[in-house]
Swiss-Prot record:
Cleaved signal peptide residues: 1-19
Places the protein is found: Secreted; Cytoplasmic vesicle, Secretory vesicle
Primary location: secreted
Family: Belongs to the alpha-defensin family.
Cystine pairings recorded for this chain: C64-C89, C66-C81, C71-C88
Matches recorded under PANTHER family: ALPHA-DEFENSIN 1 (PTHR11876), ALPHA-DEFENSIN 1-RELATED (PTHR11876:SF2)
Name used for this protein in its record: Defensin alpha 4
InterPro entries in alphabetical order: Alpha-defensin, Alpha-defensin_N, Beta/alpha-defensin_C
Record function comment: Host-defense peptide that has antimicrobial activity. Exhibits activity against Gram-negative E.coli (in vitro). Probably contributes to the antimicrobial barrier function of the small bowel mucosa.
Any one Pfam family match given in the protein's UniProt record, by short name: Defensin_propep
Organism: Mus musculus (Mouse)
């Protein structure tokens, strides 16, 4: 009888050990932010000579990014990139 109880306990423990990593992984993905959610940057290129000339004149020497949500500290909004992104450039 003792052997049966011990064997059952070991089997239950083995199942619990296998189930815990799956639960932890699910919980981590729910609570953690998606990688770079706030730091998503999108590269933008302007087509044609006129677009690139205007872009170079107004933003010469600046490194600007399309960010989701809000700009980082030290940056300001210079426009939008599509519907959900802000065009953020360093303050001058």
């Amino acid at each position: 009888m003792k052997t049966l109880v011990l064997l059952s306990a070991l089997v239950l423990l083995a199942f619990q050990v296998q189930a815990d990593p799956i639960q932890n992984t699910d919980e981590e993905t729910k609570t953690e932010e998606q990688p770079g959610e706030e730091d998503q940057a999108v590269s933008i290129s302007f087509g044609g000579q006129e677009g690139s000339a205007l872009h170079e004149k107004s933003l010469r020497g600046l490194l600007c990014y399309c960010r989701k949500g809000h700009c980082k500290r030290g940056e300001r909004v210079r426009g939008t990139c599509g519907i959900r992104f802000l065009y953020c450039c360093p303050r001058r």
